[in-house]
Amino acid sequence: MSQTHRILLLNGPNLNMLGAREPKHYGSISLASIEEKIQTLATQHNVKVECFQANSEEKLINKIHESFQQVDFILINPAAYTHTSVALRDALLAVSIPFVEIHLSNVHKREPFRHHSYFSDVAEGVICGLGAKGYEFAFLFAIDYLAKK
């Protein structure tokens, strides 16, 4: 890439507990380890990545708003807000930044209430069920997407 692109990695509620929280569904890797891997990839691809996690819908929305005209791509794991937050969806649409929706677990193999997403129909793509590797795949997709712009 000739210019340095900026990517925002957003993680929603309870993802700060990765590694300890329900490893059957989410694996044993910590969020810090996932972020470290993405930062390593970013360095290799000459991309700047900012990582942000919040348990609060308001903080996530504010971070999205702050990204307007500052960020080229968003990688988001909205966690439980996937199934409930029209406000987060509206924030993403308001800033018009392309994004990929990420889920560690395969939400379609879980409880029925997890099968609906307020984001997937407006996302560039959705990655679910691939564990922490899903973040890497989403990052590489973003790199490819931005290279084609």
Curated annotation (Swiss-Prot):
GO biological processes: amino acid biosynthetic process; aromatic amino acid family biosynthetic process; chorismate biosynthetic process; quinate catabolic process
Enzyme Commission number(s): 4.2.1.10
InterPro entries named among the record's database cross-references: DHquinase_II, DHquinase_II_CS, DHquinase_II_sf
Residues that bind substrate: 77, 83, 90, 104-105, 114
Associated pathway: Metabolic intermediate biosynthesis; chorismate biosynthesis; chorismate from D-erythrose 4-phosphate and phosphoenolpyruvate: step 3/7
UniProtKB keywords: Amino-acid biosynthesis, Aromatic amino acid biosynthesis, Lyase
Gene Ontology molecular function terms on file: 3-dehydroquinate dehydratase activity
Residues annotated as catalytic: 26, 103
Recorded catalytic activity of this chain's protein: 3-dehydroquinate = 3-dehydroshikimate + H2O
Family annotation (Pfam families): DHquinase_II
Annotated site location: Transition state stabilizer: 21
Known partners and oligomeric status: Homododecamer.
Function summary: Catalyzes a trans-dehydration via an enolate intermediate.
Family statement: Belongs to the type-II 3-dehydroquinase family.
Name assigned to this protein: 3-dehydroquinate dehydratase
